[in-house]
């Protein structure tokens, strides 16, 4: 059912593209499905895409889409996924480790659209998942210790294949196991205030539209409504 919902919401997002010429692409499994649907549509030969990760760049190239890199013109729309979405449309992101580039795309897009299945809806961010933080490799053990001390939470360097997970930017991901967030904006600011932190996977006020699939229906949520 979840796979069905992902494809359903991806197809719904495709309807929003219109005559857009430059499209930003987030990362993750739902965005990968969106790329597949985009490649099958009549828009495929008329659009250029800016990927947020090597993962989604590979998917886009394999699907025959024209890939470009950020330089000058900004995306009219970026389509992205999320790990959690709260009632104010704040987002938790970074499960795939692409949070920094995703946030750059989100900030520089005219419209930022989130697509997700219904399991991503939560009352408060960090209800189900740890908070991803991208940090510099330089002094990473110090940064980890400072995060643990500052927030009195368990925090660990993300491991992949027995080694620290390295982002596309050459950084490390630290996952903070914190309680559900009462004030995401404050938490974002506090985490970014720790030297060594590059970016944090809290996206406050960036999502313009959130498309949520539940069963055979897609609900559209808008910022401010």
Swiss-Prot record:
The first-level EC class reads isomerase
Could you tell me what this protein is called?
Answer: Ribose-5-phosphate isomerase A
The UniProt subunit note reads as follows: Homodimer.
Q: According to its UniProt record, which residues of this chain constitute the active site? A: 102 (proton acceptor)
- EC assignment: the record states 5.3.1.6
Respond yes or no to whether keyword Isomerase is given for this record.
Answer: yes
Where, by residue number, does substrate bind? 27-30, 80-83, 93-96, 120
Which keywords, in A-to-Z order, does the entry hold?
Answer: Isomerase
Tell me the organism: Korarchaeum cryptofilum (strain OPF8)
Q: Which GO terms describe its molecular function?
A: ribose-5-phosphate isomerase activity
